[in-house]
């Protein structure tokens, strides 16, 4: 296990060495000593049930629940959807569990469903899951498509049974989670990531106002304990809805403005319009997905470099980080912190401070 972690650290820091100087600080990788059966998510393709026994990442209780659901579906009067013939009903099912042993389930079916199942259809299954696993099925969502093509994330989905969403506590804040919102899959390292980011920046003692971008702006900013102004830009409509709900159900220290920014136009405008004569310094934090930053954000960072001067980048994919730094040009890494967020995978989370 530990040799894999050291190798991941070496690969991570080797990938960014061209942007480091002799004075760059590269800290030892942080990790949690559990590299199997840690993830609180599992998605099951009902055409490939071997996924259950072959999985060593998701929590064992989720794999047991997946078997119970698979048996129920295989014994039902409706067949699994066959992608070759285009016939069938059940397509896939996914699970997300919180630390309170509450379960969220999303089912994808194909074709007309109203005359087949109703909200009582899964009552016995819910009871069976509780009796065998002591897990409360808190909500079931149903999503349907008219053909073999999967629908968009927000398309044709509805709460089918139970309450709307589950909550996940991160650093004292209860975040609402529904299907397709942003959530961390590893409960062991989730708080480690955001605590480390806050310490890496020394954020509670930094007096600057924050400009933050990413689907995890809530995790980064709502968990701060100090009072400061925050402009938070998030590209996902589902995250936007759940974050607004989270705001109303928690006591938040920061003065935050949330913006839905699907094309990154708002954060680009914010950076482009920063006044060089404004004496209020700004702290910029970007946390893009695996595709990295959009070009308009990169151009805005380049234009505002005389004001921003430095920023923090939370990277989940080193190739995107490297590409973005090349495109930003004339920058270097002052310090970096690797975190093994998802053991036994190729991905390594890296927090970097970039000087322009």
UniProtKB/Swiss-Prot annotation:
One of its GO terms (cellular component) is virion component. S-adenosyl-L-methionine binds at residue 184. Belongs to the class I-like SAM-binding methyltransferase superfamily. RNA M5U methyltransferase family. It is an enzyme of class 2 (transferase). Its EC number is 2.1.1.-. This is Putative RNA methyltransferase R407. InterPro entries: SAM-dependent_MTases_sf (IPR029063), TRM2_met (IPR045850), U5_MeTrfase_fam (IPR010280). GO terms for molecular function: RNA binding; RNA methyltransferase activity. One of its GO terms (biological process) is methylation. It comes from Acanthamoeba polyphaga mimivirus (APMV). The active site is at residue 316.
